[in-house]
């Protein structure tokens, strides 16, 4: 049997010959539809026909998978072309008695991009700086109908045709505060509406932009420059002009000690307040730091805090309680670098120690000895004080001031006898008349004749005893009348004497003036007038 392998090549050869040397006849080959747009991987039915009734050959030339359908007639055939992956131009051919001819159909494949991706945005972007948006698109056809759009929310920022593989579209945006939290994305539009289809859109995953404003000025840090061991201080850090202020992170630390501040926010400012405690391990110069972090930037302020130990000065008495006449040494000692004064008297030479010698007297009982120490720390003067009291033991005292020796009271009047003994310890006081009748010292009493007399007041303590006589005189009413009469007579006599003195004085003055007048003017005889 003759081999049949040359037969498949015959249609292609006829097509080629028909294209190069078209026949002189009027036979025509046609194809339907002449243009087709279909999705990638799709199928299409193509009808090839010829104008002659009995063609020797009628077919289609294409690299696509094809299948001749049972439909058809003598001068036309229907083929199904499948798995169309790219643009193609299948060609129908025919060989008729009066010549060969061909006809092409144009298959256009469309498909949306396989990758639409917006390049990642910075985690934070400063306000006032340019931001570059970059979108990459892989795949998609037909490219003539494919457009790339960059968006902020739904607002278009830039639109360009997709060119190249991959296609890349970029634009620059000046970042504003209003852009904080905005979503940026990239969208492709495959517009096949002119071909009777629809608009196909693919959108990338959105990226949210975070913007910020962090002023160039460092935060303001307020803190004590010196801090004593085992005490607490307050640190305040603040900064204005922040956006968004709630996103700002504040870090406060003293040396290796992280502080826990309480942060108060304003519209565009914050204030962080923290307490700091120091111990003996922190003594020395420590670094205090306040750092503000916003976005990908930070601002910080550093200060030094001097931690010091300065116990109160120590006041030492030979004994806190001594007897009268005892010599007492008072010492004041303080920090080795301190300068001390004792009762206002500085140490000589100036230093951390001073002492005072004295002989205890009753006036020293209850006397306070105050030691003041001054220490310079980081240019500041720190003052500490300590006080001790001296108690002096001395015997009882009864003097005229506190216990008058004579009282004179009207009978039946209300009086309070006062007699107070001094001494340390406070002595016991008793005032007795005739050894038995007590004087009600400190009590309000009605004065009677029984109260009159001389009392012996005795003050006694562990330091000794002292006595004093006190006399009480009681004035009865009859004595009062005599006194009143005497006083009245004295007043009358005094008044009469004064009147006599004044009268004689005036008389002498008149006599003197008369004598002076007679010396200056001669006397004239009195002449009796002649009666008419």
Curated annotation (Swiss-Prot):
Listed GO CC annotations: plasma membrane
Topology in membrane: Single-pass type I membrane protein
On modification after translation, the UniProt record reads: Monoubiquitinated, which is promoted by MARCH9 and leads to endocytosis.
User: Motif Cell attachment site: which ranges?
Assistant: 152-154
Q: Which residues lie on this side of the membrane: Extracellular?
A: 28-480
GO BP annotations, alphabetical order: cell-cell adhesion
Please give the family membership noted in the entry: Belongs to the immunoglobulin superfamily. ICAM family.
Role according to the record: ICAM proteins are ligands for the leukocyte adhesion protein LFA-1 (integrin alpha-L/beta-2). During leukocyte trans-endothelial migration, ICAM1 engagement promotes the assembly of endothelial apical cups through ARHGEF26/SGEF and RHOG activation.
- Please give the name of this protein: Intercellular adhesion molecule 1
What organism, scientifically named, is this protein from? Pan paniscus
Taxonomic lineage is: Eukaryota, Metazoa, Chordata, Craniata, Vertebrata
């Amino acid at each position: 049997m003759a081999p049949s392998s040359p037969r498949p090549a015959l249609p292609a050869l006829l097509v080629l010959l028909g294209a190069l040397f078209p026949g002189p006849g009027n036979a025509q080959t046609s194809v339907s539809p002449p243009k087709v747009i279909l999705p990638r991987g799709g199928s299409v039915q193509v009808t090839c026909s010829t104008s002659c009734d009995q063609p020797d050959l009628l077919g289609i030339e294409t690299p696509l998978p094809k299948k001749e359908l049972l439909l058809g007639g003598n001068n036309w055939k229907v083929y199904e072309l499948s798995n169309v992956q790219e643009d193609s131009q299948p060609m129908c051919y025919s060989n008729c008695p009066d010549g060969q001819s061909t006809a092409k159909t144009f298959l256009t494949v469309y498909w949306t991009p396989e990758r639409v991706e917006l390049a990642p945005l910075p985690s934070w972007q400063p306000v006032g700086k340019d931001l570059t948006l970059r979108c990459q698109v892989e795949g998609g056809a037909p490219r003539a109908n494919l457009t790339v759009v960059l968006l902020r929310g739904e607002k278009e920022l830039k639109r360009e045709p997709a060119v190249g593989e991959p296609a890349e579209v970029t634009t620059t945006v000046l970042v504003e505060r209003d852009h904080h939290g905005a979503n940026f994305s990239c969208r492709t539009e495959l517009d096949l509406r002119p071909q009777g289809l629809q608009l196909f859109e693919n959108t990338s995953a959105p990226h949210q932009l975070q913007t910020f404003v962090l002023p160039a000025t460092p935060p303001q840090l307020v803190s004590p420059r010196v801090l004593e061991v085992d005490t607490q201080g307050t640190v305040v850090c603040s900064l204005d002009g922040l956006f968004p202020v709630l996103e700002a992170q504040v870090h406060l630390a003293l040396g290796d000690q992280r502080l826990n501040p309480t942060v108060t926010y304003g519209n565009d400012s914050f204030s962080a307040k923290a307490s700091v405690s120091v111990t003996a391990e922190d003594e020395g110069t420590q670094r205090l730091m306040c750092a503000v972090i916003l976005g990908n930037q930070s601002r910080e302020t550093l200060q030094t805090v001097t931690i010091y130990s300065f116990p109160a000065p120590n006041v030492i008495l030979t004994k806190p309680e001594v007897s009268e006449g005892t010599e007492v040494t008072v010492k004041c000692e303080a920090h080795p670098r301190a300068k001390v004064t004792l009762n206002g008297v500085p140490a000589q030479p100036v230093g951390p120690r001073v002492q005072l010698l004295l002989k205890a007297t009753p006036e020293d009982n209850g006397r306070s000895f105050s030691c003041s120490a001054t220490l310079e720390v980081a240019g500041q003067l720190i003052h500490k004080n300590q006080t001790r009291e001296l108690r002096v033991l001395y015997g009882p005292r009864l003097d005229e001031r506190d216990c008058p020796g004579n009282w004179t009271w009207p009978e039946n009047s209300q009086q309070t006898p006062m007699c107070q003994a001094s001494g340390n310890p406070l002595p016991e006081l008793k005032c007795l008349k005739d050894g038995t009748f007590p004087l009600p010292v400190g009590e309000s009493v009605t004065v009677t004749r029984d109260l009159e007399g001389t009392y012996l007041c005795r003050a006694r303590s562990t330091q000794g005893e002292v006595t004093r006589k006190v006399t009480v005189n009681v004035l009865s009413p009859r004595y009062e009348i005599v006194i009143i009469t005497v006083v009245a007579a004295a007043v009358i006599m005094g008044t009469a004497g004064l009147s006599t003195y004044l009268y004689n004085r005036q008389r002498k003055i008149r006599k003197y003036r008369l004598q002076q007048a007679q010396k200056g003017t001669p006397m004239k005889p009195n002449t009796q007038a002649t009666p008419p």
